[in-house]
Amino acid sequence: MEMQPTRASSRLRKNNSMDDLCTGIATKCKPYTLDQSKAMNKKEKACDKDYITFYMKANNNFRAEFNMATYELFKDKLFTTIDSMSSDQSTLLKYTVDNNTDQKNMVVFQTIKIYHMNKRSMLPNRRASFSINLYNSTSSLLTNGTGINLFIDDIFSPILKCLQQQLDCIDIINADMKCALSNSTSDQSQV
């Protein structure tokens, strides 16, 4: 008997526990191939950006743009923070991660969906409280959803405070990354 695939939302509604939400990372392949030289140029330009610029957009969307080193450090701390929040029983948060890849299996962007659990039933709410879209080629993120304030207050702000204490290291990492990217793009142009 052949199993019919179910959508993630169907699995969430049928699931009695949140265990499946955090057990793996789903991969979705997009029908295009990322232009690697353009992506490398964007990354090199991202080294020259301000540490971070963030603002609210229309329809309760939160946008943040980073320089390259800050983005990579932010991503690392973001996953650590979300992991610790989801394992803390008092926060009642769970999450899913979708890696969106191109046809060469390069991760173009990641989508993290954060779900609140219903306190009485301990089941996930049917809709994500908020989604975090991490755009790797532009070193930026876009967050939207009804729980955007939770993201800003409990996730984004503490990570930002932590990163502000590492600005000297970020400058060094950024300079090293820019040099490596410059060498890489000049090597590619000579081929």
Model-derived regions, located:
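Polybasic, low-complexity terminal segments and linkers that are predominantly intrinsically disordered
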Residues: M1-K30, L141, N174-V191
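Short Lys/Arg-enriched alpha/beta "domain-start" segment
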Residues: C22-F130, D153-P158
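Gly/Ser-centered flexible loop/linker motifs
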Residues: I132-L134
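Eukaryotic regulatory low-complexity N-terminal regions enriched in Ser/Thr, Pro, acidic
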Residues: N136-D187
